[in-house]
């Protein structure tokens, strides 16, 4: 079961990803985790990535793609994988196709958790975080018992600077522009499946499970 998981910020991609890997026993591979592991293991590519990250620069595609190739070649990916956060561009998607062709592991589905912009705005601007323990709340979906106060330790809740309306709106616009060519690429390939992310979390996952039902665990 070889999957790519997509979705704009706030779509609930992380939640669905956790459930998929738990139920199907495949590794959840995110770009950040891959970089951290490669740097910790001090692989040549990991050290190269670190040199860019330490300077605050973007890691070049060839290094990122090399790290992805190393990761997908590990034993725990024999029965499949869930890629999250990669690819981000059509060039990366084409490189991924080449890697998977070499490994004989074609993509089964690219699952896009689809949520409209207004709903994403509500989800992202409603987030509040405890200043003491870091617990995340949401004014609509998961409010604290007492407004502005953490249930666990009474700490003050705050809104992250990048969760305000203007910043969130800009972030979503940028993400939409970047993501659309990738969605078009995978749609043309016949891999793309849109899942309605507007529903309750459990209903979203029910749709995902129905989709994956035809694939062997």
Swiss-Prot record:
InterPro entries: Adenyl_kin_sub (IPR006259), Adenylat/UMP-CMP_kin (IPR000850), Adenylat_kinase_CS (IPR033690), Adenylate_kinase_lid-dom (IPR007862), P-loop_NTPase (IPR027417). Its EC number is 2.7.4.3. It is found in: Cytoplasm. SUPFAM superfamilies: P-loop containing nucleoside triphosphate hydrolases (SSF52540). Monomer. Belongs to the adenylate kinase family. This is Adenylate kinase. ATP binds at residues 10-15, 127, 136-137, 199. Catalyzes the reversible transfer of the terminal phosphate group between ATP and AMP. Plays an important role in cellular energy homeostasis and in adenine nucleotide metabolism. Its main location: cytoplasm. Residues 30-59 are annotated as: NMP.
